[in-house]
Amino acid sequence: MATSVSLLTLPSSRIISHVLTPVPSKPKAPVVLLSNSLCAPLATWDHVVPKLTSEGFAVLRYDQPGHGASSVPTDLSSTTFDIIADDVRELLNHTSISRVHAWIGVSMGAATGIVFAAKYPNIIGKLVVCNTISCSPLKAGGPDIFEPMIKSARRTGSMEETAQTILERWFSLDWMSANPDETRRVRQIMLTTSIDGFETCCAALRSDSFDLRPLAEKAGEGIDGALFIVGENDMDLPEHMLQLRDGVKRGLSKKDSKVSVGFEVIKNAGHVSYIDAYDQFVTVITKFLRQ
């Protein structure tokens, strides 16, 4: 699909690229915001957007710093999830969107959604949290998976090797072999991420300030409903996301003691299940959006 990208200059003087896709027959359609993974510019959602608009939802997408046509800060180490959430708030103001029907976030886009909901309550209706870690590697006491990829990109002067490494984390070799055209499409989109963009977004993921666990309950207080989605093959994320789900549910329960927060495991899917398990993913989200 052809994607006409708009550019907004933020108060920080950075540029955020974005696309708002309307429903032609429904000028006041509820808006679904799609928020991306690291190294996954907004065009990775191209197959999902027509499905959502056919269901009567306008769709807003944006690129994180250094992804697509979004620019980076002068200090690459300065990016945090708080800052990215503020960027999205500016974007919503610019597009005159006072409330989004749903925020669907994958990986760091899901983390941004939780931070946004905690910081700006009652703007997100439904929050869909997909395939996210709950805190930085430092906070988790594990190895820093991001630093080697940054060093690889800097050493080679290209995102080629790093993009391939990430592709192989996202998708199984069997899936890539069976879907060469889609693998090629995704890889080409990934390569529109600059090395600076990759490093500055990794800074948010590596930051000592990145910890969703104390924010989950507050995020739940500021939304109307939530759904958690994780790919079956995405490492140990199902376990970590259950903890986040419980926190969000505690917040939602303050408004409705009988509230339920769904937790869907997408079979045979990896980190970006809207790509490698498209049919299952859109079935799950459209059912939730209609509720």
What positions do the PLM features span?
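Conserved serine/cysteine hydrolase catalytic core
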Residues: 195-256
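Catalytic histidine-centered segment of alpha/beta-hydrolase-like enzymes
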Residues: 236, 263-283
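Flexible "cap/lid" loop of the alpha/beta hydrolase fold
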Residues: 114-156
